[in-house]
Design a protein with these regions (language model features):
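Short phosphate-binding/catalytic loops that engage adenosine nucleotides
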Residues: 259, 547, 596
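Cysteine-nucleophile active-site neighborhood
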Residues: 564-627
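Conserved acidic segment of CheY-like receiver
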Residues: 524-529
Length: 627
């Protein structure tokens, strides 16, 4: 056990205790607890050198939650421990300009951010009054370089962009929509899969002589609720067949006018789900490992289950980085087909154009807050392999200029071009005009802002929103003038497919087999080996049908056939040289005489052709090993 104590910039004294835990079951137990208790589990189950490692961290029963919708915000104490923190929080927020604050009860303060009438240069857009002003003030209240894990954890909704870029909204917003839910924990489980270690960090807070020490950590339960009426709800989308393709055509018209260069438009899929969020999360994590996996109990019966492949913004010290993803193709059935798909993706000029444009916009986002000359691409069109998809990814970094911080970097990218488009402001307007429903959390971010000034967030993609027995998945495609409407509609459905596999339950391995194992059962195959380097691979392929396969060199095979061997099939293997080098004519005479079916591969086929009167010639360029 390790103990330490420190004082934050806002004068709060914090005592931290670190205790080691058993490695294996740690995160599984936490996932189950989240079915009934508010909190977060972030899980990175994907590795990429210099970018991602495997870890889990999370908690339940946070003492404080910060929520916002539009320009209104609330800070709630969820237990007596949180009430101790509410007074310094209220004092800090009340000192902000353009902010009205009231303490509604011993457990809640609320307020509203006034829209600014001040003019400002674009470089300072991230400093206009918004709910992020409150978040920045609270981060300063708890700020300290002594700890790298304490901070705000949760979800950032898509509509937060309208505090950065205000505009007229067309789509109605659901009454229960929230734009921001962030928890302040007092106990964090941290699992390092590289080191195979786990530990719990526990925090006690002292404010003006009053401490949380000894107070219970529990908070009221907020379980997942199943709605019986939802159990019979059919699968549905907010676009009918062909309607998304028609939307693509409208986007192409905007490209032709020069209104847009690219835009990411999505459709929403929904269906009943009777399983608990933790069950769906475990299935999704197993089937679709990702660097930004998450299970979040947001409270009010709302859950997010995520397997996001894309970093949104990560800040460590003054370094800010992003990893834009654009360019997608389905995985192959095996590594050989994967290689073919990767080649196809890398040779696609459309996909290259998509990613180039995304990265150009991303570099522009950083340039608003970065030291001149520090923004650079450190990885170009790198391949990342996921369960069903292959992506091309760029890696971009910069150095934050003074006085900007991680929140400035976060806001300057709102939202990533890979979920909006370019020019970004016009793309966001197009999305508001053309999509059928509010995005809620989709296209926003999940992650944490730690009080040491760092940040790690992933884009809210490949994410299931669960509430009242209904699971929702939103998926989009990056549209360009060259887009094929039907192909783009198919891409959105492909992206959603992995999510619905987790929602509906696992598919058995037998159902995924591309052949019927019984077709060769009871059959005997003689494979004649012409000194080839691939004969045993060929034999194994045949055995997968259930057939019994025996491999022999030509002389032994002919001897066995003369002495009564009676296979159901003889396979003549590939090999070097010419058929005459192996007396293939003598072998085939026995086949014809005995009426035994024969199948030839490469050299074997050549021997059959010659035996029945055909002729062979040499190619100008040998083709062995070429596709």
């Amino acid at each position: 056990m390790q103990l330490m104590s420190y004082r934050t910039e806002g004068g709060i004294r914090i005592q931290r205790e670190i205790s080691n835990q058993p490695y294996r079951p740690a995160d599984n137990a936490l996932a189950g607890a989240l079915d009934t208790r508010r909190g977060v589990l972030f899980s990175s189950s994907f590795e990429f050198p210099g970018r991602y490692t495997r870890w889990d961290l999370g908690f339940v029963d946070p003492p404080v939650v910060f929520t916002a919708r539009g320009r209104r915000f609330m800070v709630d104490a969820l237990n007596q421990r949180g009430r101790i923190l509410l007074d310094p929080i209220a004092e800090t927020v009340s000192a902000l300009a353009a902010t009205t604050v009231e303490k509604n009860s011993a457990n809640r303060i609320s307020g509203e951010i006034e829209e600014t009438k001040e003019r400002f240069p674009e470089e300072h857009r991230s400093r206009q009054p918004s709910v992020f002003s409150v978040l920045r003030a609270l981060a300063h209240l708890f700020a300290s370089s002594e700890d790298q894990h304490l901070g705000f954890y949760g979800a950032f909704g898509y509509d937060l962009v309208f505090q950065f870029e205000p505009m007229q909204l067309r789509l109605p917003r659901p009454d229960d929509q929230r734009d921001l839910v962030l928890f302040l924990p007092d106990e964090i489980l941290i699992v390092d899969h590289m080191r195979q270690s786990a530990a719990i960090h526990r925090y006690e807070f002292e404010v003006a002589g009053t401490s949380t020490s000894g107070l219970p950590r529990a908070t009221p339960h907020d379980p997942y609720r199943l709605n019986r009426a939802a159990a019979t709800r059919p699968s549905e989308s907010d676009h009918g067949p062909g309607e998304y393709a028609a939307l693509v055509e409208r986007a192409r018209a905007a490209f032709a006018r020069g209104d847009l260069f690219e835009v990411v438009v999505g459709q929403l899929f929904a269906e009943a789900c009777g399983d608990l969020p933790s069950v769906v999360f475990q299935r999704l994590r197993q089937a679709n490992p990702a660097p930004y996996g998450a299970l979040i109990n947001l409270g009010q019966g709302e859950f997010l289950v995520a397997a996001s492949p894309e970093m949104y913004v990560r800040v460590e010290g003054r370094r800010i980085e992003t990893c834009p993803i654009s360019g997608t193709i389905a995985r192959g059935r095996d590594p050989v087909e994967d290689a073919e798909r990767i080649r196809e993706l890398l040779n696609s000029t459309k996909d290259e154009s998509e990613l180039t444009m995304c990265t150009d916009v991303d570099r522009n986002d950083k340039s608003r807050v970065a030291i001149p000359g520090s923004v650079r691409v450190i990885g170009r069109r790198q391949i990342e392999l996921y369960s069903r998809l292959i992506h091309t990814v760029d890696h971009v970094e910069g150095m934050l200029a003074e006085p900007f911080d991680a929140l400035d970097g976060f806001l300057s990218h709102a939202w990533a071009v890979t979920v909006t488009g370019a020019p970004k402001l016009w793309a966001i307007r197009f999305i508001e005009e053309q999509e059928r429903s509010s995005r809620r959390w989709y296209g926003g971010a999940i992650g944490r802002i730690t009080f040491d000034g760092n940040m790690n967030t992933g884009l809210t993609l490949r994410t299931i929103r669960m509430q009242d027995g209904v699971a929702e998945v939103r998926a989009g495609a990056t549209l360009l003038y060259d887009s094929d409407p039907e192909a783009e509609e198919a891409e959105t459905r492909l992206k959603a497919a992995a999510m619905f596999t987790a929602i509906r339950g696992p598919v058995s391995a037998a159902a995924c087999m591309s052949f019927t194992a019984a077709v060769g059962c009871g059959r005997k195959v003689l494979l004649i080996d012409h000194e080839d380097s691939f004969v045993h691979t060929l034999a194994n392929y045949i055995r997968t049908t259930g057939a019994e396969v025996v491999t022999m060199r030509p002389q032994l095979a002919r001897s066995e056939l003369r002495h009564g061997a009676n296979p159901d099939l003889v396979v003549l293997s590939p090999g070097p040289g010419r058929p005459a080098d192996f007396n293939m004519t003598g072998t085939l005479e026995l086949m014809v005489e005995r009426h035994i079916p024969v199948f030839g591969v490469c050299l074997g086929l050549q021997g059959i052709v010659e035996y029945f009167g055909g002729s062979l010639d040499l190619l100008d360029i040998p083709m062995h090993g070429k596709p």
